[in-house]
C-alpha cells in the first residue's frame, strides 16, 4: 500500500470481527512503529498489548471515565494497546542547556507521532484501530501494569474490521488550513 493512499484511507474502526490478531502480527506492527521519529531519538513510546478479554473488560469499566461510546468499542475489540511514554526524556538536550519551552509536554508530541505511525502500520497490515483520548490514565496504568517512570498517552483498540470500511469524512480545504507568510 502506498503511503499517500494509506494516509488518505485510514479511518477509526469501532466494529471488529470476533477474531484475535496474532502476537506475530502485533510484533510486526510495533517493530515498524519503533521507527517513528522522536526528540533526539529518545524513543520514549512504549506499547502494552492486551488481548485478554477480562483485562479489556476492566479497562472498559474502569478506564474510560464511563464514556459509553468508548465502552462499547472496547467491549467489541479483540485487543487494545496502551500507548505510554517514558517521562522526562524528551524536550531537552545536553543536560538541559538547550530545551524547548514545551519540555513538560514534548513526550506527548513524541507519543502522538508514535501513535499515528502505529495506526498507519496497522492499517497497511489489514488491522483497524481507534485511538481513545477520553481515558483515566491512572486506572489504565494500574490495570496494564505500566511502570512508574511512564505515563499513559492513549488507548488504541485494534482488530480486523467488521463490515464495510468507514467512508471518508470531509476535510477542511487547504486554503482553510495553510498560511503563507512571504515577508
Model-derived regions: residue spans:
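C-terminal helix-cap and adjacent tail motif
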Residues: 3-13, 17-18, 89, 154-183
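Small-aliphatic-rich amphipathic alpha-helix that forms the alpha element of a beta-alpha
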Residues: 29, 33, 96-143
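A glycine-rich helix N-cap at a beta->alpha junction
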Residues: 71-77, 146-167
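Glycine/small-residue-rich phosphate/adenosyl-binding loop
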Residues: 41-111
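Short alpha-helical scaffolding segments that buttress acidic/His motifs in well-ordered protein cores
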Residues: 7, 29-33, 81, 156
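Short secondary-structure boundary segments
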Residues: 85, 134, 160
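A short beta-loop-alpha structural element at the N-terminal edge
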Residues: 19-24
